[in-house]
C-alpha cells in the first residue's frame, strides 16, 4: 500500500488568541500573508494583462518573476507541471497560414504546463511582445488592443488557476 504525502498541513498555534497558519514545506503562511500574496499577485497580473506597446515585455517578466519568487505559487505550478509532458510548441500554440492561434489543452495540468513553459520562453529569450501579438490574426485593431487580446488569450487562464488556488488555500485556513 502506498501513501501520497502532501506538503500542506494545517496547524494551530495558541498564544493570546488562535492563529491559523499554513505550513508549506517548512514555510509558514498565515491568513494575512496569504491575502497579501493574493493582492500582490492580482496587481502584478493586472499590470501584465494591461501592457501596451511601450512596455514591451517588462510586465510579462515581472509576472514570471513574481511566480518564481513566491514559494506557494511556484510550488503549485511545479505540482501541476510534474504530471504533464505536453510540449507547448506542438500542442498549445498552433500556426496556420502564417498566423498563430491558441489550442487549449483539455487537461488542467497540461494547460498550466503549456502556459508556464511558454511564459518561460517569452521571458528568457526576451521575445518581443509586439511581434508575438502580431502573429495572432485579429483583423483590424489597434496595436495595444492586439497585445492585450494576446495576453488575455494566452495567459489569463494561468492567472485564474493561481487565483483559484490562493482562494482555496484561504478557505482551507478559515475552515480549520
Regions found by a protein language model. Give the residues of each.
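Intrinsic-disorder-associated, low-complexity terminal segments enriched in Asp/Asn/His/Tyr and depleted
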Residues: 3, 16-17
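Aromatic (phenylalanine/tyrosine) cluster motif
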Residues: 3-6, 27
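Charged interaction/catalytic cores of defense and host-pathogen modules
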Residues: 29-174
Amino acid at each position: 500500500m502506498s501513501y501520497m504525502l502532501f506538503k500542506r498541513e494545517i496547524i494551530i498555534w495558541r498564544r493570546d488568541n488562535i492563529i491559523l497558519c499554513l505550513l508549506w514545506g517548512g514555510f509558514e503562511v498565515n491568513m494575512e500573508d496569504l491575502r497579501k500574496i493574493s493582492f500582490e499577485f492580482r496587481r502584478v497580473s493586472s499590470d501584465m494583462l494591461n501592457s501596451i506597446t511601450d512596455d514591451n515585455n517588462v510586465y510579462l517578466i515581472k509576472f514570471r518573476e513574481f511566480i518564481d519568487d513566491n514559494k506557494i505559487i511556484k510550488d503549485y505550478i511545479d505540482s501541476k507541471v510534474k504530471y504533464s509532458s505536453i510540449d507547448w510548441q506542438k500542442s498549445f500554440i498552433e500556426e496556420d497560414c502564417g498566423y498563430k492561434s491558441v489550442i487549449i489543452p483539455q487537461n488542467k495540468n497540461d494547460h498550466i504546463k503549456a502556459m508556464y513553459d511558454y511564459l518561460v520562453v517569452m521571458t528568457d529569450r526576451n521575445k518581443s511582445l509586439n511581434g508575438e501579438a502580431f502573429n495572432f490574426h485579429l483583423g483590424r485593431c489597434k496595436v495595444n488592443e492586439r497585445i492585450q487580446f494576446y495576453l488575455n488569450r494566452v495567459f489569463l487562464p494561468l492567472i485564474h488557476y493561481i487565483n483559484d488556488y490562493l482562494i482555496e488555500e484561504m478557505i482551507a485556513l478559515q475552515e480549520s
